[in-house]
């Protein structure tokens, strides 16, 4: 059985425990063993420590990666920010010996060292490459037949592509999330703003008006071009932003429709028959109708 260190990150732990429940449900059922990585901390993501202290950022990231390296396993996350931050920090250490040396000097004060072997995989890539589309199809009890999905890979699933361990994805024409959704039975057509930012992160904190404008433009594009029944994302931040912001836009009269939003692991958990209240129970935009449709599509 393949084993990964489950790196939750702050966002999922504090805001979306249903995503954590989904991961803990589907991966053992798909033959992936999870290690809790006791002692893990914030990754830390862009806009925080990386903006002011490169070595400090890399040291925190390396400490997290070392928790896996000590056990001979890679990390796995459902958070694009964690995925990007941990892998970019690793890339900086592997390409800059001086940063790597300084990081290990810091880690030595707590009895740790990071050689650069352990990396962070994204749940979508683990599902796509380790599990595989055929096994995924065989593992589900319910399908997405008749459901049109708008995929939202999110910025940090795609960029900076050179730092990621799985390099097969074309960030300008991403296929992994679309093919995973299609394996579940969905139609996942292209739409113009597919790779555009959701407006989360520092932008939402510093300029919410611009942040919500990006959501409005993306939502209108999804509605007009593919009239999606569901938005599926690989990113916990995109999940929160698209779920919450569209409700605000509706209340302000800026859009007059709603599209439920789910993380990929939540969709798979629903298709595998896990309890909807546990794996998809937190939302702002209503989900009951789409969950009902999924559970009516019994194989």
Curated annotation (Swiss-Prot):
Primary localization: cytoplasm
Residues in the signal sequence: none
EC code(s) of this entry: 1.8.-.-
Gene Ontology terms, MF aspect: oxidoreductase activity
A matching Pfam family: CCG
GO CC, one annotated term: cytoplasm
Record keywords: Cytoplasm, Oxidoreductase
Keyword 4Fe-4S recorded: no
Enzyme's top EC category: oxidoreductase
Subcellular location field: Cytoplasm
Keyword Ribosomal protein carried by entry: no
InterPro entries, A to Z: Cys_rich_dom (IPR004017), HdrB/HdrD_reductase (IPR051278)
Record text on subunit structure and interactions: The heterodisulfide reductase is composed of three subunits; HdlA, HdlB and HdlC. It forms a complex with the F420-non-reducing hydrogenase (Mvh), which provides the reducing equivalents to the heterodisulfide reductase.
UniProt function note: Has oxidoreductase activity. The Hdl and Mvh subunits may together mediate electron transfer from hydrogen to an unidentified electron acceptor on the cytoplasmic side of the membrane.
Family assignment from sequence similarity: Belongs to the HdrB family.
PANTHER family, sorted: COB--COM HETERODISULFIDE REDUCTASE SUBUNIT B 1
Name this polypeptide is given: Heterodisulfide reductase subunit B-like protein
Organism: Archaeoglobus profundus (strain DSM 5631 / JCM 9629 / NBRC 100127 / Av18)
GN (gene name): hdlB
